[in-house]
Amino acid sequence: ILGSLLTGARDAAGAYYRSRPLLISLGLPLADALGSPLGRAGGFSDGRDIGVVCNLPNREGPVVLPMSGDVGSQYTPAAGWAQAITYHRDTLQDPRYAGCIAVAHGGDGSVATNGFWAALTMATTLRLPMLFYIEDNQLGISVPGSMQTPGADIAKNLDAFTNLAI
């Protein structure tokens, strides 16, 4: 669903290892999505995928920014893309950036990382066109939500941020 809503010519997503459905919806060939993590030669990783670590350049629509295996590493590149959208839209007056957005897609365990907090601070302070899409299954890798977030409620802990809609 998320991928179908990224319709801007300069939209981008910073993704993580569970983002395979998002990548497929944005144009990753199904053969690559299934074959690369199985060590299949050819495709975007030539068999060296460690679990959806790729990028998906697209000159005509939304892109997936280069991914890393580090937890939380998707947030700051997405914030940088959002900052670039603002620059191109407002300073350069480039109409291709009107209505565009950067999405950071992550799991609940990644909100405990420096990258998340840095990107959140940038996005709210600079009022960047950015969406944080967090999948919260109350289990960050193997740590229960109650042990990684005070009160075990990520959204409630973000209430104090201005310029942030939850």
Language model features with spans:
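Cofactor-binding active-site loop characterized by glycine-rich and histidine/acidic residues
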Residues: 1-126, 144-165
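Short, proline-centered helix/strand-breaking motifs
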Residues: 129-130
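Segments that shape or occlude catalytic/ligand-binding pockets
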Residues: 134
